[in-house]
Amino acid sequence: MFDRLQAVEDRYERLTELLSDPDIVNDSKKLREYSKEQSDIQETVDTYREYKNVKEQLVDTREMLDSEKDPDMHEMVKEEFNLLKAQQEELEERLRILLIPKDPNDNKNVIMEIRGAAGGDEANIFAGDLFRMYSRYAETQGWKIDIMEATPNPMGGYKEVIFMINGQGAYSKFKFENGAHRVQRVPATESQGRIHTSTATVACLPEVEEVDVEIHEKDIRVDTFASSGAGGQSVNTTMSAVRMTHLPTGVVVSMQDERSQIKNREKAMKILRARVADMYMQEAQKEIDATRKSAVGSGDRSERIRTYNYPQNRVTDHRIGLTIQKLDQIVEGRLDEIIDTLILEEQASKLERLNDDL
């Protein structure tokens, strides 16, 4: 572990030199890249330096303890030694956690896609409930919600809703929502009082900047068409709707939320970039983690991750076996207990892997 920490500190010092180099200062791309890299390891380096300082103090205090003859002074030095020892152990644990590989996307905004799946109208109504739940949670975090595309369901909810949540660390909180969500309840239209089971799928993609993934203009086909409203009737004859196809991957995005074709192009490009990056990332992750399973599931869109049982006021996250009898609070956006537990489980899993590698 300490060889790895020393390598991190050496890299930090090298980055400090690079960031003072006039050639780097005048290269905005490299300057941004190196500044971010240094910022990402700043806390690890600071903690490691504090650890080394405490370790030196321990050596000095140990020598004093061995040589001190006066009983009162010996007791004082012993107390100081014990405090430093406890501090050293605490810093060691912090360093282990800081060495856990970080998701480079954690600080990004998140693009979320919710779709009604099995269950017809009830599935679409549930998709609307999930959108409301996530919106409420985002509001408690002080994050902004921007609906990018929505297809309302005549009976309520959404057949599909795509939205962005803008806020520092939004992706780190929502990334565990990837997968199929199941609801068990009596629909409003059910006259016999029978419980129905329906599902909705959730996809969470980090917002991707142009510098993060390169998409060439020649690889995109853009088609324009008139926007359509409920029932398919034309509501806009200015051909403002846009369909973008990324030819190498076959990823398609349609956007007609805005009256302006330019704005629809901008929104479509954001989603396209995120989906293409996600596809590449998923492929790479499959190769890297072919023999490893995540503590909180695979992240596959089809994986059933959670059940919302209304009659029993129960929510169960199947990935970690967590059951909470607070469905009424959770659907109002009080997701902290679930999200925090998932984050801790993922950290514990990564820490276990790290300990195996050290």
UniProtKB/Swiss-Prot annotation:
Source superkingdom: Bacteria
InterPro entries for this protein: PCRF (IPR005139), Pep_chain_release_fac_I (IPR000352), Pep_chain_release_fac_I_sf (IPR045853), Prokaryotic/Mito_RF (IPR050057), RF-1 (IPR004373)
Coiled-coil intervals: none
UniProt PTM comment: Methylated by PrmC. Methylation increases the termination efficiency of RF1.
Subcellular localization: Cytoplasm
Sites of N5-methylglutamine modification: 233
GO molecular function: translation release factor activity, codon specific
Main location: cytoplasm
Cellular component terms (Gene Ontology): cytoplasm
Protein's UniProt keywords contain Protein biosynthesis: yes
Keyword Cytoplasm: yes
Keywords for this protein: Cytoplasm, Methylation, Protein biosynthesis
NCBIfam families found in the cross-reference section: prfA, PRK00591.1
Function: Peptide chain release factor 1 directs the termination of translation in response to the peptide chain termination codons UAG and UAA.
Similarity comment: family membership: Belongs to the prokaryotic/mitochondrial release factor family.
Protein name as catalogued: Peptide chain release factor 1
Organism (species): Lysinibacillus sphaericus (strain C3-41)
